[in-house]
Design a protein with these regions (language model features):
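FAD-dependent oxidoreductase catalytic-site/capping-region signature
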Residues: 2-183, 191-212
Length: 212
């Protein structure tokens, strides 16, 4: 499609470090070319938004069974921000986002901060806002982790169940430092190769490849 309806309105992303001593980025700034209300839904009217994403969360949630039948709903506990370091990353991310939106390039655009709101200042106030509004950003992973004591084997087979494989983001032991769509597609393609018995030679990066 063409125009705004033909896109997902997330036009750009930036990767930054919440602390200068980090070896790699741990925070993603997501720029949205639309007015997003608190909670993530699109609002009516002109606007833009900047979302803050912690790329390497240390908090761990859980999914447990609530009964013995397939109709019993699982018990899902995201356990968000159970590790205090995740909160610190998001606080620094909000501060960085505010600095970006106060840059000269945004002068004269007529924007006003809707959330957290300019009245929310200081660590304690930001922490309270984040605790009340944090979410998974639709990227939960790891509920069927591929690891020695995990749900699936290196061939994506569910341990203890014949003929069943899992090929989605749930097999990732930890989340990728970015959106999960592309690696999830790769997992599906790899699963198809495993089922077909097709083996490809491992890709080797060029010797002169530079990494960030």
């Amino acid at each position: 499609g063409e125009g705004v309806p033909g896109r997902n309105v997330f036009e750009a992303a930036g990767y930054i470090r919440s602390r200068p001593d980090l070896a790699e980025p741990d925070t993603q700034l997501v720029f949205c070319a639309a007015f997003r209300k608190p909670g993530g839904t699109l609002g009516v009217g002109h606007g833009y938004a900047l979302g803050i994403v912690g790329l390497k969360p240390k908090s761990r949630g859980s999914i447990t069974l609530s009964g013995s039948t397939i109709s019993d709903q699982p018990i899902i506990d995201p356990n968000l921000l159970s590790d205090e370091s995740d909160l610190e990353v998001l606080i620094e991310g909000v501060n960085a986002g505010r600095r970006v939106l106060s840059a000269p390039a945004f002068e004269g655009k007529g924007h006003a901060e809707i959330a957290p709101g300019t009245h929310v200042q200081g660590r304690q106030a930001l922490a309270e806002h984040i605790r009340n509004s944090v979410n998974t950003a639709f990227h939960p992973v790891g509920t069927c982790a591929m690891k020695p004591d995990g749900v699936v084997s290196g061939e994506l087979k569910v341990r203890g169940v014949d003929g069943l494989r899992v090929a989605d983001a749930s097999i990732m032991p930890t989340i990728t430092s970015g959106n999960t769509h592309a690696p999830t597609v790769m997992i599906g393609e790899k699963c198809a190769d495993l089922i077909r018995g097709r083996t490809l030679e491992a890709w080797q990066p060029p010797a002169d490849l530079e990494t960030v």
